Amino acid sequence: MLILTRKVGESINIGDDITITILGVSGQQVRIGINAPKDVAVHREEIYQRIQAGLTAPDKRETP
């Protein structure tokens, strides 16, 4: 595993087409932006695990 240290506003490039930028840090939470081609799937880990398990996202419609 490659471990890098970045400051807000700095980026990491993966290959020629993917850029990860540190947008902000607040406490233990880090906001990142990911710029990738549309044919590259980008998911949070918990969403990816649900996809792999064949589960769908919870219904976000409100009930009266």
Curated annotation (Swiss-Prot):
A GO CC term assigned to this protein in UniProt: cytosol
Assembly description: Homodimer. The beta-strands of each monomer intercalate to form a hydrophobic core while the alpha-helices form wings that extend away from the core.
Primary location: cytoplasm
Keywords: Activator, Cytoplasm, Repressor, RNA-binding, Translation regulation
Name assigned to this protein: Translational regulator CsrA1
Pfam families linked: CsrA
Species for this entry: Pseudomonas protegens (strain DSM 19095 / LMG 27888 / CFBP 6595 / CHA0)
Gene name in the database record: csrA1
Inducing or repressing factors: Expressed at low levels during exponential growth, considerably more protein expressed in stationary phase (at protein level). Positively controlled by GacA and negatively regulated by CsrA1 and CsrA2.
